[in-house]
């Protein structure tokens, strides 16, 4: 697979819970695509997950993907926690239902369609892809707020 796509994702929430947005910057062979959306009542973690899901869902065929996020929650979930959640039927070690299991399952489904390399970047330090995803996530929040 020579189709390597860069995806930068971010989520934003004004109040937690509160109105939230997600943003995605996709870069493929120098061409950029922006995606964003939002929800009236959500959390920052749900928006971080939505950004990753929507970015991967936008790919029409199997791709090599480098997905960059500033979310430790997404990184730890995908790289550390999910394997055991799945073994336990989407329960935590304490036998509690996994929070946001609906979105973790959707992310798992999308990840399985592609070859994804996950990268973490510290947020708000000027990383161009992350900053752009942050702007898009905030656009999602603004659009949800404008609909009230």
Curated annotation (Swiss-Prot):
Gene for this chain: rnhA
A GO BP annotation: DNA replication, removal of RNA primer
Name this polypeptide is given: Ribonuclease H
SUPFAM superfamilies, sorted: Ribonuclease H-like (SSF53098)
Top-level taxon in the UniProt lineage: Bacteria
EC number: 3.1.26.4
Alphabetical list of PROSITE patterns matching this protein: RNASE_H_1
InterPro entries: RNase_H, RNaseH-like_sf, RNaseH_domain, RNaseH_sf, RNaseHI
Alphabetized UniProt keyword annotations: Cytoplasm, Endonuclease, Hydrolase, Magnesium, Metal-binding, Nuclease
Alphabetized Pfam families for the sequence: RNase_H
Native species: Pseudomonas entomophila (strain L48)
């Amino acid at each position: 697979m020579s189709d390597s796509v860069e995806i930068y994702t971010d989520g934003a929430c004004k109040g937690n819970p509160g109105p939230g947005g997600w943003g995605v910057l996709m870069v493929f062979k120098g061409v950029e695509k922006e995606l964003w959306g939002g929800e009236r009542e959500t959390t920052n973690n749900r928006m971080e997950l939505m950004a990753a899901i929507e970015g991967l869902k936008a790919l029409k065929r199997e791709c090599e993907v480098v997905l960059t996020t500033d979310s430790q929650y997404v990184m730890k979930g995908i790289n550390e926690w999910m394997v055991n959640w799945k073994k336990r039927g989407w329960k935590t070690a304490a036998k509690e239902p996994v929070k946001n299991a609906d979105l973790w399952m959707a992310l798992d489904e999308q990840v399985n369609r592609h070859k994804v390399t996950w990268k973490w970047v510290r947020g708000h330090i000027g990383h161009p892809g992350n900053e752009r995803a942050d702007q898009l996530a905030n656009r999602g929040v603004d659009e949800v707020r404008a609909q009230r």
